[in-house]
Amino acid sequence: MTTIVSVRRDGKVAMGGDGQVSLGNTVMKGNARKVRRLYHNKVIAGFAGGTADAFTLFERFEAQLEKHQGNLVRAAVELAKDWRTDRALRRLEALLAVADNKASLIITGNGDVIEPENSLIAIGSGGPYAQAAARALLENTELEASDIVKKSLVIAGDICVFTNQNLTLEEIDGTQTPSTV
């Protein structure tokens, strides 16, 4: 599995993920890029679950973003509908975390589109550890979103055997295009 974390603070949204790909109890790859930019660099997305499944979902989600002129919520709802009703897509096992400068969402294969409390997303096997860390940092520090994401992923990587510390971080600052952190 993996860990993906997204935090929104002070007009910025950051998302990061680890790089571990596991097959059963074996680490197959340590430097996978599970967080990427979509739709003209205006959206960041991360996945937890099967790698091949996630790439299929990224393609479908980006097509929905194009179809709906970058409207994140509309694209997420349409992807969730397709995911739930399409026989081939229903077999895909992954979760998507997506964010733009206005919204942060989790998209599931059950047809759910969830806007989390406090714009904090943490998915994957290390998600609960990263969520607890990010929440504590949000409530008790003035750290920037990208720093909270990084520290949360490091903590999750220390605890979860399916999460490493080879991190990919992306950030969107207001209406600017995302930058690699």
From Swiss-Prot:
Cellular compartments per GO CC: HslUV protease complex; proteasome core complex
Short name of one Pfam family: Proteasome
Enzyme Commission number(s) of this protein: 3.4.25.2
Catalysis performed (reactions): ATP-dependent cleavage of peptide bonds with broad specificity
Domain of life: Bacteria
Subcellular location: Cytoplasm
Major place of residence: cytoplasm
Assembly: A double ring-shaped homohexamer of HslV is capped on each side by a ring-shaped HslU homohexamer. The assembly of the HslU/HslV complex is dependent on binding of ATP.
Function description: Protease subunit of a proteasome-like degradation complex believed to be a general protein degrading machinery.
Protein known as: ATP-dependent protease subunit HslV
